Amino acid sequence: MITKTLRRTLVSLAALAALGAAGSASAAVYVQCGPGNNGVANDGSIRPAFRTGPSVAGAVECMHLTAGDGFISMADGRTLYSFGFADVTSKAANDVMLDSLAANFAAPTIELQQGKDFYLTLTNVSMAMRPDLFDPHTVHFHGFPQQPPVFDGMPEGSFGVNMGSSVTYYYKLNDPGTYMYHCHQEATEHMQMGMLGNLFVKPAQDAILPNNAPNPLNIPKNLNGKKLAGYVYNDGNASTGYHKAYPLQLGSMDHVFHELHLGVQPLPFKDMKDDYPMINGRGYPDTVNPNPLPAPAEKVDYLTAQNRPAESSQPVNSLITATKGERVLLRMTNLNVTNYYTITAQGLPMQVVGMGARQLKGPTGTELYYETASVTLGGGESAEVLIDTSQVAVGTYFLYTTNLNFLSNFEQDNGGMMTEIVIN
């Protein structure tokens, strides 16, 4: 086991090496966004009007991610070495290669809108703590139905993005639903190390919600006396409407695998056994902390030596809040490489309206939604779950895995894959 003191010593040495190499390093960062590249500012950042999110009014959405390494904190205080993605959409191109140890877990959430053109640039900034590695990286848009094979990311049939390089992926967002994304190069290793993120596409039907917006089908905009915030699918009748939405990515890590990786030792693929279960990259009680978690000391040491600020590696929380009468959407995904997980919500009514980014409907259009007390997801699976709070008592409920051995942070009980649902 690598002690905390030794780990911080390794970080300090890596920081000194990075400073020594900074003057001679050379890389080309090339960002693409829209026809004629009109979404890219002069400094290489993406213009605000083209960035992803609900405020984007145009036909094009763009994002710029980096792939590299970093450190993350477990709920029991342990620090793990990780790989991951970071969002540099607003950064100047010349600053992107300086984004050392910026990997996030979970990766930055990607929120998109049906019908738009999506340009996603990936820049490989290399591994600050493992300069011996020359790993390429990719972004695999998991579940995207019209993905060309060359964008799949598997090394056998498509390309990878090499160190110091940038590649832009293009997608026409024809189908709404809950997806996910991950690196597909050396997938078992890179996914175990943390290259996983939430991704969802909101339906065109959401366009009817603004005041005075055309609504030719007279689709209801309100439920339980409250205006809806959106729909999961183009349902035509508001059956998938919701007031609040939360992405919840299930995952876990094997701390031995991560420590051996940092120690440049052979990796135990055959013996991989995850012992840190998480939701959105955190174990309970960190899941309900509404703030970004502080950066681990190892990351702070490295970036302080370069006179750069250390941002959080785990900004996404999993606290679910609602006002009584609201319908809550849970966009649940599992990108784990070792386990299936079953999730329950302590007796709250759960209705599954979609699986695998597809609305549950029969060939004649009959809705096949179903009520359940739990949802089981294997690696690469997603589900859209609605919880109607209109008949629920005000209070705090727990959403957790029924795999009770995963309600722990390694040897610390009452943690792991659990969060809270607070109904006011």
Where are these regions (language model features)?
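Bacterial N-terminal signal peptides that target proteins for export
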Residues: 2-11
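Hydrophobic helical h-region of N-terminal Sec-dependent signal peptides
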Residues: 11-19
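N-terminal signal peptide c-region/cleavage motif recognized by signal peptidases
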Residues: 22-24
